[in-house]
UniProtKB/Swiss-Prot annotation:
Residues 247-267 are annotated as: May be involved in recognition of long-chain fatty acids in GPI. It is found in: Endoplasmic reticulum membrane. Pathway: Glycolipid biosynthesis; glycosylphosphatidylinositol-anchor biosynthesis. One of its GO terms (biological process) is GPI anchor biosynthetic process. It comes from Schizosaccharomyces pombe (strain 972 / ATCC 24843) (Fission yeast). The lineage of its organism: Eukaryota, Fungi, Dikarya, Ascomycota, Taphrinomycotina. PANTHER family: GPI TRANSAMIDASE COMPONENT PIG-U, PHOSPHATIDYLINOSITOL GLYCAN ANCHOR BIOSYNTHESIS CLASS U PROTEIN. Its main location: endoplasmic reticulum. Forms a complex with PIG-S homolog, PIG-T homolog and GPI8. Belongs to the PIGU family. This is GPI transamidase component GAB1 homolog. The chain crosses the membrane at residues 9-29, 66-86, 88-108, 125-145, 149-169, 207-227, 266-286, 303-323, 339-359, 370-390.
Length: 408
């Protein structure tokens, strides 16, 4: 990193931190705590406060039917409470959100190491960091102290240390990510492919043993802290059966609101198995391009997640520009970007009309969620198709100016 670029990055991180810190201490933070686009049943800050209140009064934080998050987040908020209360909590969350921008920069730099011929990427890492840090989908969850922002941070750390070939730190970050959100286990195999490309001497069994060691350490530490093992049941259950039907940006809540109980188990299985169906085929087909497929699967994970928020969209949409040569071959970027923005704005209006004004209903709000899912799924498919095109032309440079046609 050249000195001038270091100063620019430091200035960018400082601007992002102070902007978020200022907004976190205004009425905007209180407003965002209750916005379903930012706060979900498994990431909302108010639910953490409820769990913390139960814990401080000698009760099991998972006994109230409100707190479903990882005990790691409870420990973090409890330590912040001891150090100075809500102001320290906001400072910590803002710092973590800003540090995510640093790891985005480092990942963009490592992308060039993984792609020495610059077949996929020629974009400046600093610009990728700008896109991430100044994206409202990124800093609004940081202002709202959302747990999804911490999940994004650990996910970025996992990808970065995998791209560095540091298997012990990678396994630790992967354990942290899975402990916060068990669904993140879907990223284990594609992120392992990144590690394998950078350090071919590492075996999967070796990584898995270290991963289990760190995960066991987190479970034991949480058990001592809570004096209970209820955290092994309650948080996992809410991800598996989605019994909290609070409206969110996802597809599950409305579907299971209307579903007869006789069919609930079957469709829970369908929703759970759907993301798994894409992981192995995509990873096997493009095993030699592990970083772009990991980012694509992050987008897929946010599409089928039980309780998604705008924070889940931010990490996928902000990392895509790393592969600017792939984006140049994406045909539907304008359509998909407009669909995502349109759905987010329309969804906020429909939710306000439904809940606040009482002149709408859930059907209108869920329709905006379907538009969001359609735009996101089309963007993922467009990215994967463009990735295959760029890869094919790189291996067949003599056909560079010959357009490919679909076989009828």
């Amino acid at each position: 990193m050249i000195p001038n670029e270091k100063l620019k990055l430091l200035g960018l991180l400082s601007i992002s931190f102070f902007l978020q810190w200022y907004l976190a201490n205004t009425w905007i933070a209180e407003f965002l705590y209750r916005r379903i686009e930012v706060s979900t049943p498994v990431s909302g800050f108010l639910r953490v406060r409820e769990g913390l209140y139960l814990y401080e009064n000698g009760l099991d934080p998972y006994s109230g039917g409100v707190f479903y998050q990882s005990p790691l987040l409870l420990i973090l908020n409890y330590c912040c409470e001891l150090l100075g209360g809500i102001s320290v909590t906001r400072f910590v969350y803002t710092s973590i959100s800003t540090m995510g921008g640093l790891f985005v920069y480092l990942i963009a730099k490592q992308a060039r190491v993984l792609d020495p011929n610059q077949v996929l990427s020629t974009c400046s890492p600093l610009w990728i960091s700008v896109i991430y840090l100044l994206n409202p989908l990124t800093f609004l969850p940081g202002i709202a102290c959302s747990a999804d922002m911490i999940l994004n941070f650990t996910t970025l750390m996992t990808i970065y240390f995998a791209s560095c070939g540091s298997y012990a730190i990678y396994a630790c970050c992967m354990a942290l990510t899975v402990f916060i959100n068990p669904n993140a286990l879907l990223l284990f195999f594609p992120s392992y492919l990144i590690l394998r490309k950078c350090n071919s001497s590492i075996k999967f069994r070796q990584i898995f043993v270290v991963f289990l060691f760190y995960l066991a350490g987190l479970i034991i530490t949480s058990g001592f802290f809570l004096n209970s093992l209820s955290f092994l049941k309650i948080p996992f259950r809410v991800y598996l059966d989605s019994h909290d039907l609070t409206p969110n940006l996802g597809l599950w809540w409305y579907f299971f609101t209307e579903m007869f109980n006789e069919f609930r188990t079957f469709f829970l299985f369908v929703f759970a198995i759907l993301p798994l169906m894409f992981v192995l085929p995509v990873s096997i087909r493009l095993y030699y391009l592990p970083l772009p497929i990991t980012i694509a699967l992050i987008g897929l994970h946010s599409l089928f997640k039980a309780y998604p928020s705008i924070c889940d969209l931010s990490i996928f949409l902000s990392l895509l520009p790393i592969f600017n040569k792939v984006q140049d071959r994406m045909r539907y970027s304008l359509l998909t970007n407009n669909a995502i923005v349109f759905a987010l704005v329309l969804g906020s209006a429909f939710y306000h009309s439904w809940i606040t004004l009482g002149c709408g209903n859930a059907n209108f709000y869920y329709a905006s969620n379907l538009i969001l899912a359609l735009g996101l799924s089309l963007k993922i498919m467009d990215f994967l198709k463009a990735l295959l095109l760029v890869d094919w032309y790189a291996n067949h440079p003599q056909h560079e100016n010959i357009p490919l046609k679909q076989v009828q």
